[in-house]
Amino acid sequence: MNRYAETHYKFRLPWSPLHRRLPEMIVDAPWMAAPGREVPLFLCVHDAHHFPVTLRAVRVVVRAGGEMHKTEMTFDLRLDNPFHWIDLPWPGPKTVGENLVDVLFEIEDGKGRRRKFVNHNLPTLAPQSLSVLRMSAALAFPSGWTSGDLHCHTSWSEDPVEWGGDPDVMRRAADCQNLGFWAATDHSYDFAWEHPDWLVPTDPVKRFRAFRDSLPKDEPGRSVVLPAEEVSCGNRDGRNVHLLVIDHPEYLPGQGDGGRRGLRNKPDLSIGQVLAETSRSGAPAFAAHPKPGIGLVQRLLFRRGDWDHADLLPHLHGLQFWNGKIGDDFRHGRALWVADLLRGNRRLPIAGNDAHGDLNRATQVSRPLFQLRQTRRHRFGHARTWIYLDSEPTRTSIRTALAGDTATILSDGPFLSLRVGGATTAQERSSSGIELRATSPAEFGNIRAVRVYAHIKGREKEDLLLNATPDAQDWSHRMDLPSGALYLRAETETSKGHRALTRAVEPR
């Protein structure tokens, strides 16, 4: 599980090695910064209403380009709210390349005892430096393309094991990365419980409306924030799976795997029932991490399952099989999407990261009650969904694009263009045949592989039309369109392990 980790909950046990009578305190900053952008740096504080402390001093050290810059500040700041997000200064210039950041902060508890920590105060974790990549140039996507993170969580997702990021903080991080949009896909089961007392039931309809009203509104030049919901619902076997619903106006109940009802873990609604609701509002709906690799404990305690062909029902717009990292969940989810394409459907692929805040890295509970760990596999804004818009991004234009026939590319860095004669959108249409272009920023390595797949009429599987190994930063290629091609799609990888893939493009 990826998140700002909740360490205080003990499951009614008398003791846990993760429990400290201090608030959780984590230093965070975006993992990447677009050229010339200011990098916001935060001290994120959770549960200080239970464990009040006073922030006394902060020292920030940044190492980049062979130089070290630092700044120090003294405070007399009382921390006693459920959440605090404290801005910290960034010392030194905007040095291109990797910037390593370390923050030493000193606090005083209620008994007057002073303690110092580096980057966080979480038990069992070493204080690793934050790594911020300042890009030398913008990502190489042509004008009109805009990118977003379509699966992430804010502070409205809060429960016994996790808490998410502040929406305004996440928007500043999105602006730093030049994200055009992001979806606050907070858990359906968390809306049914009070804040900050997340074990006290509340009215989920009222809380969901408050959530929608609280999100930052459209503002020129800033990332668009999409109100959304990650709905727990029942698959063909009656097991809990997750469905991303973008900008549906009403709350959709789903507490099956929320962990607060004990063994009463059956889904509240089926996939079909949820899609019936979204079809009425026109809200885009996507299968979330459809092949996550569910362990035995989650299957038993939370009745969790995965998506299969029988679950890909009408009014489902696509599949989010890229969930931050590249692993078996990505490969098996992509295989499910391809199998759906071969059946004649043209659902969109989308990418997200399932970040709960997690601007620089994610904190995980690796062993409940006993051990934490950190990973960079689920960082906010890392795996992106790129869409083409004819106008300035707004909540309405992005919602419309995701629900319709829009040119789409998934990427964690490189650009990949696939153009085919007769395609429905201008961004995917060539004058004749197949046109390819792949480019990668220097920071992400050279293009080392480009593959083109096609479904030829009468065949049960895709054909591999091209398997090129260019080893170049900018590469283009033309080839003939095979007879009987029903769709084509393309993928690319770089020498540093970054990748991009297109949606399925139909020749006409």
Predicted features, each with a name:
Residues 126-127, 133-288, 295-296, 320-336, ...:
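A metal-dependent hydrolase metal-coordination microenvironment
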Residues 153-155, 303, 464:
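Compositionally biased, intrinsically disordered low-complexity segments enriched
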Residues 146, 221, 239-241, 281, ...:
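Residues that flank catalytic or metal-binding motifs in active/ligand-binding sites
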